[in-house]
Amino acid sequence: MAVPKKRTSKTRTNRRRAQKKARAPQFVECPQCREKKLPHRICQSCGHYKGEEIIEV
């Protein structure tokens, strides 16, 4: 079985783990109703996506 030749330092381990942090979701404004929504998603309040009504709300 493969075994590491050198011990991984705390700094190297922490640097690797720093990429796994949780980020706050970025919201954008819906151009139709001005509500906050997630990017590249249908607006939950008006049902529009890319200027077209996808679902009736």
UniProtKB/Swiss-Prot annotation:
One Pfam entry name: Ribosomal_L32p
GO cellular component: large ribosomal subunit
Organism: Natranaerobius thermophilus (strain ATCC BAA-1301 / DSM 18059 / JW/NM-WN-LF)
Gene: rpmF
Source species, domain of life: Bacteria
GO MF, one annotated term: structural constituent of ribosome
Annotated region (Disordered), positions in chain: 1-23
Annotated protein name in UniProt: Large ribosomal subunit protein bL32
Keywords, in A-Z order: Ribonucleoprotein, Ribosomal protein
Similarity section: Belongs to the bacterial ribosomal protein bL32 family.
InterPro entries: Ribosomal_bL32, Ribosomal_bL32_bact, Ribosomal_zn-bd
GO biological processes: translation
